[in-house]
Amino acid sequence: MSDQKAITSEQEMKAYRVQGFTCANCAGKFEKNVKQLSGVEDAKVNFGASKIAVYGNATIEELEKAGAFENLKVTPEKSARQASQEVKEDTKEDKVPFYKKHSTLLYASLLIAFGYLSSYVNGEENIVTTLLFLASMFIGGLSLFKVGLQNLLRFEFDMKTLMTVAVIGGAIIGEWAEVAIVVILFAISEALERFSMDRARQSIRSLMDIAPKEALVKRNGQEIMIHVDDIAVGDIMIVKPGQKIAMDGVVVSGYSAVNQAAITGESVPVEKTVDNEVFAGTLNEEGLLEVEITKLVEDTTISKIIHLVEEAQGERAPSQAFVDKFAKYYTPIIMIIAALVAIVPPLFFDGSWETWIYQGLAVLVVGCPCALVISTPISIVSAIGNAAKKGVLVKGGVYLEEMGALKAIAFDKTGTLTKGVPAVTDYNVLNKQINEKELLSIITALEYRSQHPLASAIMKKAEEENITYSDVQVEDFSSITGKGIKGIVNGTTYYIGSPKLFKELLTNDFDKDLEQNVTTLQNQGKTAMIIGTEKEILAVIAVADEVRESSKEILQKLHQLGIKKTIMLTGDNKGTANAIGGQVGVSDIEAELMPQDKLDFIKQLRSEYGNVAMVGDGVNDAPALAASTVGIAMGGAGTDTALETADVALMGDDLRKLPFTVKLSRKTLNIIKANITFAIAIKFIALLLVIPGWLTLWIAILSDMGATLLVALNGLRLMRVKE
């Protein structure tokens, strides 16, 4: 551990919300300023979520002073009650018309219009015309000049430094009209950039409003409405039909269907009854439920999702790291190129000083890296927000990019490709004189007394067939270790067990057709159980871990999306593994694996394919998940472990969201690459116009503003990617 990390870990971390970020560069500068405060050991800005984590001691006044260059407002992280109020205030702020938020921009634009009118009436050199352009420039660019001049004095070069030098230079050579236009268009570009990021952030902030802020709670024999901040673990919450559930808990009374789309993305309501878990933010559609609270409001699943999503926005993707590194050298290089353009032609080629200084100033403007800087954050924030709303938690931009580059995906079998719950797949009565339902009631009555893990499958089958077994009298019930069970019903001794048990019981030879039938069932990955007496075999029941209905379709979609290899990893025997693997359509099957074998196999896949994902439950597969490029856990809504350990968590307990996540990730990767390429290309093309002397301040600022706007809109498209 480094000294810096050691210091950071010892300090108390305080989180703050920040209002007023216009760009990622401003966020980086704010972070640098905060780190320089005397009581601060470290600080980390999360531009995507508009937050800063401060390690050490700093007052609000000190933090706001560090952000004075951008007039940043800093507030401490809120409690649930305060956060709900903050969301309301943010919503009100969002509803304020664009022109009211940027009134100075409007006034500056009006002054420019009057300036051009005066230029037409009185001439360009008229003092009134000059004063109108000058006033427009100062009103529209005051904040720009303050920051730009401070940067110049400190020899810090960013986009505002470039613009300030360009504006001052333009004013010196008398290009008042063009300079005023540059200032206004730059201000508009910044406003649009901020608006775009706010739109992307709003998709996350809206998650905070999913769960109600108050709940009806039983206390001292009364039902009272209480704010969620004041609800304690163990309280009984009453949820009426049509109401949203305010807190996580367990049903203690009632039956209903609950729509969990807000958490898991599943559109089909899930039945809930006693002992079933419910989540804050989900909708109770039918019956009245009484729920015992199991988590405080800050620990609910939705709260953890919001927290993890905001943390994810702060994780820098590889493309963001590239942009940051590139921008560090890019701005000084642009300053040097602009200086060379302004000086070299007049000094060595008899060029006009005025013409080439103008060209140099245009290079400064066109070199402004606005579009480049926003290209990645706008895409990452939009994609993560979209995924969260559809029940997929992505822990950071790095995992979005790695998901987009996946070549192979490994799946655990049990509970992932299969339901993880045994079910009766075959029930064949061999003696046609016996009533099937009566025999099933006897079988169920015997299995009810058994501790065998497959007994639950038979009991579930009886419930589905509406067969009662509670009135069946079983005498002398006993377990035959390793072979089966037996019991007496109506004077007849019945046995349920393996083929081996009946080969020992029956005096006559084991029927060849029956043996073939059992072998076929076993080859299909099923466990065959025989029911009979000491004299004859009555029926065969096959039980298996059922394949999820969606597994085959999902694997087909993944192959269509370009995933080259899908592998099933399981500890089951080869027969069962091959049967299930064949049903779902995986490319490869690896059976009889120990946890260490799964880990080794993932490492082998990574060496062969590079980017490999592992899909499991987030608990038993933890080593393999950790070893993969991207660990994907299912059923994140029901387990804190999955939320914490996985890189990507599918909140619903099925794989339907996996193809969407791969699709979204690939689109994100493509859009980020397109944005970066376009942002750099447009600058390069504009710079080429310097050679024939065609580059003007108009063209420079319009290319910069246009590139920023197009990059932002392209990134926002990720909010609309559908399943």
From Swiss-Prot:
The segment(s) forming the HMA domain are 12-75
| Enzyme Commission no | 7.2.2.21
State the active site.
412
Q: Does the keyword Transport apply?
A: yes
CDD domains noted in UniProt: HMA (cd00371), P-type_ATPase_Cd-like (cd07545)
Give GO terms: molecular function aspect only: ATP binding; ATP hydrolysis activity; metal ion binding; P-type cadmium transporter activity
Q: Which residues, by range, are in coiled-coil regions?
A: none
Q: What is its main location?
A: membrane
Pfam families assigned: E1-E2_ATPase (PF00122), HMA (PF00403), Hydrolase (PF00702)
Sites binding Cd(2+) sit at 23, 26
Q: Which reaction does it catalyse?
A: Cd(2+)(in) + ATP + H2O = Cd(2+)(out) + ADP + phosphate + H(+)
Q: How does it sit in the membrane?
A: Multi-pass membrane protein
From the record, give the transmembrane residue ranges: 103-123, 127-147, 168-188, 329-349, 361-381, 671-690, 694-716
- Swiss-Prot/TrEMBL GO biological process terms: response to cadmium ion
Sorted alphabetically, the Gene Ontology cellular component annotations on this record are: plasma membrane
Q: Which UniProt keywords apply?
A: ATP-binding, Cadmium, Cadmium resistance, Cell membrane, Ion transport, Magnesium, Membrane, Metal-binding, Nucleotide-binding, Phosphoprotein, Plasmid, Translocase, Transmembrane, Transmembrane helix, Transport
Entries under PROSITE patterns matching the protein: ATPASE_E1_E2, HMA_1, HMA_2
Q: Which domain of life is it from?
A: Bacteria
Q: Where in the cell is it found?
A: Cell membrane
Q: Give the family this protein belongs to, as stated in its UniProt record.
A: Belongs to the cation transport ATPase (P-type) (TC 3.A.3) family. Type IB subfamily.
- Cited function: Couples the hydrolysis of ATP with the export of cadmium.
| Official protein name in the record | Probable cadmium-transporting ATPase
Q: Which organism is it from?
A: Alkalihalophilus pseudofirmus (strain ATCC BAA-2126 / JCM 17055 / OF4)
* Lineage, top ranks: Bacteria, Bacillati, Bacillota, Bacilli, Bacillales
